[in-house]
A protein has these predicted regions:
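A domain-level signal for the structural core that forms small-molecule/cofactor-binding pockets
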Residues: 2-60
Length: 60
């Protein structure tokens, strides 16, 4: 049973989340031969002030 957690900075629309979930699920089915009915996808939005790249917060 695959469990995929998508962490992302800033908001995504419901439509974007639906498309990402569909694509990730299809990829797991095609590449790893995991049934879509057992593939879970969750989304965690991280605020820009709580995410850093190259030592700098994204809200800078």
């Amino acid at each position: 049973m695959p469990y995929i957690n998508v962490k992302h900075a800033g908001p995504l629309t419901r439509e974007q989340k639906a498309e990402i979930a569909k694509e990730v699920t299809e990829t797991m089915q095609r590449v790893a031969h995991k049934p879509a009915s057992y593939t879970y996808v969750t989304f965690d939005e991280v605020s820009y002030e709580d995410w850093a790249i190259a030592g700098k917060l994204l809200d800078e």
